[in-house]
UniProtKB/Swiss-Prot annotation:
Family: Belongs to the dGTPase family. Type 2 subfamily.
Protein name (database record): Deoxyguanosinetriphosphate triphosphohydrolase-like protein
One Pfam match: HD
GO BP term (any one): dGTP catabolic process
Amino acid sequence: MPLTCAERHIFGKSAPISRICAVELTSVAHIREVGITAADMCAYAWHMETTLDGEQVLSDEGYNAFDEERWAPEPPKSKSRTAFERDRARLIHSSALRRLGAKSQILIAGTDDFARTRLTHTLEVAQIGRQIGALLGCDPDVVDCACLAHDLGHPPFGHNGERALADIAGNIGGFEGNAQTMRILTRLEPKIFHPDGRSAGVNLTRAALDAAVKYPWTLAEADRHPKGERSKKFCVYPDDEPVFRWLKIGAPQAAKPMECQIMDLSDDIAYSVHDVEDSIATGAFDPIVLADPKMLDHIIEQTRAWYGAKWDADKLLAAFMRLRREHLFPAHFNGSRESLAQLKNITSDLIGRFCWSVETATRDTYGPGPLTRYSSNIVIPEDTNYEIVALKGIAVYFVMAPREREPFHQEELKIVSDLVDVLMADSPLPSDALESQFLADWNESTNDNERLRVAIDQVASLTDNSALALHSILC
């Protein structure tokens, strides 16, 4: 029996079976009602498999109740929404997401009405992620959740603030924006509590939380990784490891699910395309300079210094040549409505170009059907990778690297460090500047290391403007 009109409205006219399986199927009658056959259920139901050595591991297809499980138990909810739709709603309504509106992307938040903030960047990542996820058969809400969550842990002043907090937290497990995201999702954002009274954060489903974990290893695992690929990034602090171990039950070690890989790529696409758009619109970058071979050499040199020598200079040059040859930079920009429209159309063309190339390459490798969770890996053609990095290099050369030479760049580091010092000044007595929720965490702490983590949590939660304002009052 085919889907009814109402069901098609809920699931979409071409919803993959894996999407439909996200709905709780409570009876044979309901299975028949939504038009899922026994063969469909066998093909796409998520289950545990036993390996040759007897180990229980996750199978690699679809979504089921295991993926909908939450870290803290919750009472049954209305069937009007899927578990993944609830995840997305919790993030949309979170204060952590709202705060991104006043946090820097590449230009200081609030200094230009055109340029993006972390929030607008996040929304654009989510739109791109949903598009790629739909092309590859993922549940769009799982991908959307990963995209909405991916920057929640960024402190004030972006990577600059991150570096300052990492230095301060060196002896207590470090600081990393992705690990802070995990902490926000599973502890700091107020929504759900464990039966024993501990905060469970927004308590996302396993599939949604797993999709948001971009670097699925601890700091200790990163430091001893033989390939050296994880030397700086990690996703969890020592006191948050229990939820990480629960999250990764049965998952391949250090592997990222397809939905997380889509989020990661969508972030790169949005960052590369939109930050160049901002650079052009604000006058930081004029594409005409790309006609100068010496300028291209300088940009490529800076790109490789920033992103690593693994990016071949000749291939980066070829990427710039392709983008120019195919008119994917505006020939002229003067701020008029017409030039803004041309710029916007070019950004749309670039996003479509990258999404199409990835879909084609991934489908060529894995074939049709839903590509979910640990069933597959996203395939990014080399030319696409180089074009994305070339665009990111433009933002580095014309915006990010010059900012690091500005006096205020060093001042940002000092502001973040000063705020932590003030909050810790009277330890074990709490500072009057601690917000209520962090004051409660402070009062539950038993030593200075725990209290330092609380101080870092509060400073990391600040926006650029609130950090400046608090510093002007306290320091």
